[in-house]
Amino acid sequence: MKFLLLCVLLGAAAAFDDDKIIGGATCAKSSVPYIVSLNSGYHFCGGSLITNQWVVSAAHCYKASIQVRLGEHNIALSEGTEQFISSSKVIRHSGYNSYTLDNDIMLIKLSSPASLNAAVNTVPLPSGCSAAGTSCLISGWGNTLSNGSNYPDLLQCLNAPILTNAQCNSAYPGEITANMICVGYMEGGKDSCQGDSGGPVVCNGQLQGVVSWGYGCAMRNYPGVYTKVCNYNAWIQNTIAAN
């Protein structure tokens, strides 16, 4: 059965096996200025700021109304760098399939533009698709344990490589579409997890992945699966232009 990396925390219970960072370390403050926390009274997913008014996240993180929290590091404290902006539009890809998680991508329009500064900034969309072996930065406030739960207040970072299509398909036979990539370690121990869903995978300074799904978290032979953002440049640009 497919366990989604959905950071849906209802009290102490996660509704799905969501992706959170396991095996990483606390990020340096403001070192990931493009990451946002999606909030509906609690942090439930991540996202990436791509313009001063648009955020990319995962379609499985959809809610009709979202508060986007920018400039966050410690999500339990007010640190003076935060901007909280409500969504004015939340647009899932029309081809999103909630069973296969194909086209697991969505755009959020902010009700007002963010103020860009050292703590809040955009990440470029990909100029092309990154090759297997490329090292990428994954970040989020998701679960840090593969067994049990520990949701950190401080943003976590993990460097991990893009895996080959062969490795990805061998881990998940028949489940990987052309719109997915695997990132991580076949030996396990380092991965995204519940609560990281929708968050960024940035390779060579460009947004190449969105945290999507996986079997458990950080399990041997089951790397994390991510939406392949380089396939969606036209959809992103056209959607922004039309809205």
UniProtKB/Swiss-Prot annotation:
Cofactor: Ca(2+)
Example GO molecular function: serine-type endopeptidase activity
Cofactor binding comment, as recorded: Binds 1 Ca(2+) ion per subunit.
InterPro entries reported in the protein's UniProt record: Peptidase_S1_PA (IPR009003), Peptidase_S1_PA_chymotrypsin (IPR043504), Peptidase_S1A (IPR001314), Serine_Proteases_S1 (IPR050127), Trypsin_dom (IPR001254), TRYPSIN_HIS (IPR018114), TRYPSIN_SER (IPR033116)
Record's signal peptide: 1-15
Propeptide: 16-20
Gene3D superfamilies hit by this protein: Trypsin-like serine proteases
PANTHER family linked to this entry: TRYPSIN, TRYPSIN-RELATED
Lineage: superkingdom: Eukaryota
Family matches, as PROSITE patterns: TRYPSIN_DOM, TRYPSIN_HIS, TRYPSIN_SER
Listed EC numbers: 3.4.21.4
Keyword Oxidoreductase: no
Positions that bind Ca(2+): 72, 74, 82
Main location per the UniProt record: secreted
One GO-annotated biological process of the protein: proteolysis
UniProt name for this protein: Trypsin
